[in-house]
Amino acid sequence: MATRASIKISDSDGNFIANIYHHYDGYPEGLGQKLIDICDSGKLVNGLSIGRSSKQFNGFTDLACSIVFELKEHSGDGRVYLNTEDDYGKCGEDYLYEIVENPAMRQSPLVLVENMNGETELVQDILDRVNA
């Protein structure tokens, strides 16, 4: 059975950027870890620099595009879809993720998850408990 999830991406003011529906492996040790890995794979900057030696995201919306790209690239046909803001939490999801821009620009965003019990916490805190 599929472990479905949706990922809402919001800026630091709470404005909606994207809602990504992910049909399989939506549990924190799978999708949650992947989201953290994507967010940590580059540096958030305001304007790309020439001759850079590491991956950069030109602002938070560029990171949001990279999240969609990375999830879709590794999922094969189907499985990952863009939905409307109103669809968030209405597609039979087991987990609801939210990636929120950190108000302190240049820091990794907050990656949160709401579990089946309606509790919201940082994905990293869950992973730390599971791996302890």
Task: Enumerate the predicted regions with their spans.
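Low-complexity intrinsically disordered segments
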Residues: 37-132
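An exposed acidic His-Trp-rich patch
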Residues: 30-38
